[in-house]
C-alpha cells in the first residue's frame, strides 16, 4: 500500500487520509470504538481540537504522531514514531 511506508529508523510515514482501520494493521494504536473520526488526520484533530501545525506532536498509545505536511488546512503526511523498541511492543490482539 502506498498510504504508509516504514522508515529505516523504525518509524512509519503515513498519508493523513489513511483510514485508521488500515493503519492499525501496521501500527497498534488504541482506537475508541465510539470515535467520530476515521482517518489519521481526524485522529490528530480530535486530540488537538484544531488543525495541527507542521512539526506538532501528539502521543497516542505507544506512538508519537508527528505532523509532517499540511496543505490547504489538510493533514497530508504524518510520522508515527514508536516510543518503545518494537521488540517490546506486543502485537497480539
For each feature predicted by the language model, list its residue ranges.
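Cytosolic regulatory modules rich in charged/polar residues
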Residues: 1-93
Amino acid at each position: 500500500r502506498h498510504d504508509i511506508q516504514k522508515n529505516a529508523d523504525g518509524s512509519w510515514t503515513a498519508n493523513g487520509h489513511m483510514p485508521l482501520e488500515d493503519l492499525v494493521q501496521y501500527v497498534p494504536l488504541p482506537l475508541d470504538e465510539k470515535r467520530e473520526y476515521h482517518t489519521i488526520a481526524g485522529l490528530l484533530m480530535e486530540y488537538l481540537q484544531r488543525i495541527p501545525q507542521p512539526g506538532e506532536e501528539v502521543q497516542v498509545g505507544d506512538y508519537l504522531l508527528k505532523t509532517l505536511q499540511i496543505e490547504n488546512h489538510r493533514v497530508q503526511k504524518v510520522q508515527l514514531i514508536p516510543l518503545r523498541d518494537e521488540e517490546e511492543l506486543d502485537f497480539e490482539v
